[in-house]
């Protein structure tokens, strides 16, 4: 049994961590691990058997930038719906890998609906509830055999909310015989890690190649998640899926996920992520995708859309116009990005600044590709615009927002070469 976790050594320049080397796993048209960029995934909350609602939500998540989407497969009706969902998405021109989330009865569902097994791009199996007692190994093997038959990858996802109780009891008993027993939390973390690793090795013994296995071991505490994944990363070369199992609602969920995942990502740990936010009433499910993208972008992992820097405001910025302009600019670049991604590759790396007064406005604007310094209280009613560090023009009047957005569009057209294809 592994007794200690060695914290990774930071790089000498303290700016970037080498990515952990893992097997590359092909999931539909997406590659996870093997040094590829960290992949964003999400999960629906529709009744999967409701094909129309599920297709609509998958499409929304995909348009927001989700590169894989997981759906609950908990009934025969849900399993039967999966091929129809895939077909309807294909008719819409959406080719996003769908992941089937199985608990308790996955072996029965795939036996009853083999078309589901073929249509899914990946299966998620929870080793804590795939079966109990003598049935566990048999039912786990049945699921792995479906993956082998249809050439599908599997995520073996352990979760401390549904931990393998037999394994936990065994490790607790072993711990009682230690000269220096671990605390209960450490034993449970070890049980979670062992559950994932032992199940992965069992899958390999059955015949599933290592490059078709992704692991996860989720908890809901920030420090626990960091400890679990550092250990899991040291003890295997499987691709890893990161995420808190229940991050929470609103800002708490965003902060908790960011606090945990940013540490691991900066250490080169993690090949795919999901931000498990509880949506607020009326809030779009796509929020979890946007947060995942922003987390990867702010930690320097990937670029999805131009970053907009804006000052927080103070007594010098009594006008709300700079706040309104920052919102307009952010919405504009998000709206334009799908087209820019095709026609102007590289535009996602552009940086923008919307500043509210003379204190930091000109300096911050010079650091951006395009920046505007709006007048603060008592300042001259003029807004200088800087392009690549040089003052280009001063905007005045009622149309500053429209004029600044037009300058952004012009910059993209001139700077990022149009892809004629």
Swiss-Prot record:
- Gene Ontology MF annotations: 4 iron, 4 sulfur cluster binding; 4-hydroxy-3-methylbut-2-en-1-yl diphosphate synthase activity (ferredoxin); 4-hydroxy-3-methylbut-2-enyl-diphosphate synthase activity (flavodoxin); iron ion binding
Pathway listed = Isoprenoid biosynthesis; isopentenyl diphosphate biosynthesis via DXP pathway; isopentenyl diphosphate from 1-deoxy-D-xylulose 5-phosphate: step 5/6
Q: What class of enzyme is it?
A: oxidoreductase
Quote the record's cofactor note: Binds 1 [4Fe-4S] cluster.
Q: What domain of life does the native source organism fall in?
A: Bacteria
Q: Which cofactor does it need?
A: [4Fe-4S] cluster
Sites where the protein binds [4Fe-4S] cluster: 311, 314, 357, 364
Name the Enzyme Commission number(s) assigned to this protein.
Answer: 1.17.7.3
Q: Which UniProt keywords apply?
A: 4Fe-4S, Iron, Iron-sulfur, Isoprene biosynthesis, Metal-binding, Oxidoreductase
Disordered, as annotated region: 1-20
* Gene Ontology terms describing biological process: isopentenyl diphosphate biosynthetic process, methylerythritol 4-phosphate pathway; terpenoid biosynthetic process
Task: List the catalysed reactions.
Answer: (2E)-4-hydroxy-3-methylbut-2-enyl diphosphate + oxidized [flavodoxin] + H2O + 2 H(+) = 2-C-methyl-D-erythritol 2,4-cyclic diphosphate + reduced [flavodoxin]
Q: Which family does it belong to?
A: Belongs to the IspG family.
User: Which function does this protein serve?
Assistant: Converts 2C-methyl-D-erythritol 2,4-cyclodiphosphate (ME-2,4cPP) into 1-hydroxy-2-methyl-2-(E)-butenyl 4-diphosphate.
Name the HAMAP family for this protein.
Answer: IspG
Name of the protein: 4-hydroxy-3-methylbut-2-en-1-yl diphosphate synthase (flavodoxin)
Q: Which organism encodes this protein?
A: Stenotrophomonas maltophilia (strain R551-3)
């Amino acid at each position: 049994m592994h007794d200690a976790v060695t914290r990774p050594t930071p790089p000498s320049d303290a700016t970037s961590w080498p990515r952990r080397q893992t097997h590359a796993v092909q999931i539909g048209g997406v590659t996870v691990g093997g040094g590829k960029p960290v992949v964003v995934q999400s999960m629906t909350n529709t009744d999967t058997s409701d094909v129309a609602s599920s297709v609509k939500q998958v499409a929304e998540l995909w348009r927001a930038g989700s590169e894989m989407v997981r759906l609950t497969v908990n009934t025969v009706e849900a399993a039967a719906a999966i091929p129809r969902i895939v077909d309807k998405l294909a008719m819409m021109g959406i080719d996003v890998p769908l992941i089937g989330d199985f608990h308790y009865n996955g072996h029965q569902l795939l036996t009853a609906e083999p078309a589901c097994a073929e249509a899914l791009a990946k299966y998620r199996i929870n080793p804590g509830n795939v079966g109990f007692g003598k049935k566990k190994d048999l039912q786990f093997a049945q699921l792995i055999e479906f993956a082998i038959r249809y050439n599908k990858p599997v995520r073996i996802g352990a979760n401390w909310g549904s931990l393998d109780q037999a394994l936990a009891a065994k490790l607790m008993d072993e711990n009682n015989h230690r000269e220096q027993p671990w605390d209960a939390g450490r034993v449970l973390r070890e049980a979670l890690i062992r559950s994932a690793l032992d199940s992965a090795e069992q899958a390999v013994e059955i015949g599933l190649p290592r490059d078709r296995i992704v692991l996860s071991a989720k908890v809901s505490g920030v420090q626990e998640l960091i400890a679990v994944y550092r250990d899991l990363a040291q003890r295997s070369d499987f691709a890893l899926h990161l995420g808190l199992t229940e991050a929470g609602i609103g800002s708490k969920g965003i902060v908790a996920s960011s606090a945990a995942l940013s540490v691991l990502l900066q250490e080169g740990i993690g090949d795919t992520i999901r931000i498990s936010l509880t949506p607020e009433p009326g809030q779009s499910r796509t929020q979890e995708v946007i947060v995942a993208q922003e987390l990867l972008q702010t930690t320097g992992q990937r670029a999805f859309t131009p970053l907009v820097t804006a000052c927080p405001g103070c007594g010098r910025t009594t006008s709300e116009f700079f706040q309104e302009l920052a919102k307009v600019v952010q919405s504009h670049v998000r709206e334009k990005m799908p087209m820019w991604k095709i026609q102007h590759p590289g535009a996602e790396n552009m940086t923008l600044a919307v500043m509210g007064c003379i204190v930091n406005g000109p300096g911050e604007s010079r650091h951006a590709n395009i920046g505007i310094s709006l007048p603060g209280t008592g300042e001259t009613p003029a807004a200088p615009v800087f392009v690549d560090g040089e003052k280009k023009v001063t905007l005045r009047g009622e149309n500053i927002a429209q004029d600044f957005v037009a300058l952004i569009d012009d910059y993209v057209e001139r700077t990022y070469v149009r892809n004629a294809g």
